[in-house]
């Protein structure tokens, strides 16, 4: 299994995610003391040679305070307005604190569309890597002002994992208001067992996360487990720990047994396949027969039309589609070589029949293995 805590000592490129529960004072407004301490600890690590990207929530809560709202609004446009107002205060607070340590910050606001589009994804990656090379602390948040409910990341746990993929971080630290992961919610089940370490893809974690007692903080246990799995695709270790613990970042860096460590238990994906695996929404779905599931999953081969039973959605050539088994479990996703209408016509047929059916043939494969990633 290896000494994963000891491995933390060698990490130098981090993504640190901090949630609203830590940053807000009693759920409203920003906790300036927390921001001050967080900036101080990050600055100290950076002075020791660490490069750190900070993914920070808190804009809506900060905006509510500035607008004098006592209750969190339900309407999306009001939440977006609060986020727009609050993001100013959030960045001002971070900039002020980091300036005390003679360190510059940069604001990066991302949407799902920024990372779903390959060109914009590469641009975001280049910008983040350039900022790190220049010694700047990038502060990342979801661009709530323009994101719609249908295409949101949904939580900054997910965003932080995708950022970890972008910058090829060695470690993702998720700071929450709990000490780590439990097999049940310790606030309701006092006898819940603490999980110190586990493989990120350990199947038993799914059962814990899907149980009613599986909540952790506001994002929930399931989002943190999924984030660890996403981060693991680029080889990153994830530590989920309490941001209320003193000097928590320094203690993690020293290899101390704090929080829950989830280590990557699969080979890292190539950069292009990391992008594919990071797609939160797909344009369509393909149902595969048993034989196709086996060759895709076990042999790593391309998906041929003959192995597809059904097709759902309205997608164009080159868009991302999901591949499902007979139980509707998503096993893979990839860039499809034919549009939805063409796919419906050729599914279930051999590749040599494509030209006879369509009158032309672009590719023999419905999804080439180079554009297909297992999930």
UniProtKB/Swiss-Prot annotation:
Catalytic reaction equation(s): L-glutamate + ATP = L-glutamyl 5-phosphate + ADP
Residues the record lists as binding ATP: 17, 176-177
EC number from the UniProt entry: 2.7.2.11
Keyword terms, alphabetized: Amino-acid biosynthesis, ATP-binding, Cytoplasm, Kinase, Nucleotide-binding, Proline biosynthesis, Transferase
GO molecular function, one term: ATP binding
Range of residues in the leader sequence: none
Keyword Cytoplasm: yes
Pathway note: Amino-acid biosynthesis; L-proline biosynthesis; L-glutamate 5-semialdehyde from L-glutamate: step 1/2
Enzyme class per UniProt: transferase
PROSITE patterns reported in the protein's UniProt record: GLUTAMATE_5_KINASE, PUA
Subcellular location: Cytoplasm
GO biological process: L-proline biosynthetic process
Family: Belongs to the glutamate 5-kinase family.
PANTHER family: GLUTAMATE 5-KINASE, ISOPENTENYL PHOSPHATE KINASE
HAMAP family: ProB
Name of the protein this chain belongs to: Glutamate 5-kinase
């Amino acid at each position: 299994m290896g000494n994963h805590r000891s491995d933390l000592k060698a990490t130098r490129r981090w993504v640190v995610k901090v949630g609203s529960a830590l940053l807000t004072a009693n759920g409203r407004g920003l906790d300036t003391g927390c921001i001050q301490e967080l900036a101080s600890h990050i600055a100290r690590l950076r002075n020791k040679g660490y490069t750190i990207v900070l993914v920070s929530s808190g804009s809506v809560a900060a905006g509510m305070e500035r607008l004098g709202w006592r209750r969190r609004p339900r309407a999306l446009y009001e939440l977006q307005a609060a986020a727009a107002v609050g993001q100013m205060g959030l960045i001002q607070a971070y900039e002020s604190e980091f300036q005390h340590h003679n360190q510059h910050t940069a604001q990066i606001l991302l949407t799902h569309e920024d990372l779903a589009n390959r060109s914009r994804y590469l641009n975001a990656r280049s910008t983040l890597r350039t900022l790190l090379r220049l010694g700047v602390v990038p502060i990342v948040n979801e661009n709530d002002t323009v994101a719609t409910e249908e295409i949101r990341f949904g939580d900054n746990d997910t965003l932080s994992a995708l950022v970890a993929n972008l910058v090829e971080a060695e470690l993702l630290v998720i700071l929450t208001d709990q000490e780590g992961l439990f097999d049940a919610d310790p606030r309701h089940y006092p006898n819940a067992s603490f999980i110190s370490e586990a493989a990120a893809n350990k199947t038993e974690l799914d059962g814990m996360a899907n149980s009613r007692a599986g909540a952790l903080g506001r994002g929930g246990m399931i989002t943190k487990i999924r984030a660890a799995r996403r981060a693991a695709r680029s080889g990153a270790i994830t530590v989920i720990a309490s941001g209320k613990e003193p000097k928590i970042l320094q203690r993690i860096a020293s290899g101390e047994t704090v929080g829950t460590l989830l280590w990557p238990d699969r080979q890292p994906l190539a950069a292009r396949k990391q992008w594919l695996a990071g797609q939160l929404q797909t344009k369509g779905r393909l149902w595969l027969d048993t034989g196709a599931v086996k060759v895709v999953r076990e042999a790593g081969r391309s998906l041929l039309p003959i192995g597809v039973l059904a097709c759902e959605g309205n997608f164009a050539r080159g868009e991302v589609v999901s591949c499902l088994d007979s139980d509707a479990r998503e096993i893979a996703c990839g860039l499809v070589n034919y549009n939805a209408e063409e796919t419906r016509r050729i599914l279930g047929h051999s590749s040599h029949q494509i030209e006879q059916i369509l009158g032309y043939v672009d590719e023999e494969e419905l999804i080439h293995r180079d554009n297909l990633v297992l999930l």
